[in-house]
Amino acid sequence: MGSSSFLVLMVSLTLVTLVAAEGVKGGIEKAGVCPADNVRCFKSDPPQCHTDQDCLGERKCCYLHCGFKCVIPVKKLEEGGNKDEDVSGPCPEPGWEAKSPGSSSTGCPQK
């Protein structure tokens, strides 16, 4: 009887801990969606954020370019986004052009 009570107690404590940790990790999600990430990584960068609440202003915590970073989200059409915005991925670095099919640099700052 004692060992079964102990087992029930341990399982209950484990479940409570997991649920509480998930609530802390999730937080409130900010508007918009993370930009597409088409970069292949050989090694992940250390995370700069864990949730949207770690990011200032409207920035979201997104996996981009091999690690979690605070980035400006892409707006969905129903959130006032522009259908001409480039939602195929991040803006190319200066001096590079988008080469993949269907990609463009529309909506990227011109330098």
Curated annotation (Swiss-Prot):
Protein localization: Secreted
UniProt-annotated stretches for the region Disordered: 80-111
Name of the molecule in the record: WAP four-disulfide core domain protein 12
Domain of life, per lineage: Eukaryota
UniProt-listed GO biological process terms: defense response to bacterium
Lineage: Eukaryota, Metazoa, Chordata, Craniata, Vertebrata
Compositional bias ranges of the Polar residues kind: 101-111
Disulfide bonds: 34-62, 41-66, 49-61, 55-70
GO CC list: extracellular region
Domain WAP: 27-74
Span of the signal peptide: 1-23
Main location: secreted
GO MF terms held by the record: serine-type endopeptidase inhibitor activity
InterPro entries found in the cross-reference section: Elafin-like_sf (IPR036645), WAP_dom (IPR008197)
Function: Antibacterial protein. Putative acid-stable proteinase inhibitor.
UniProt keyword terms in alphabetical order: Antibiotic, Antimicrobial, Disulfide bond, Protease inhibitor, Secreted, Serine protease inhibitor, Signal
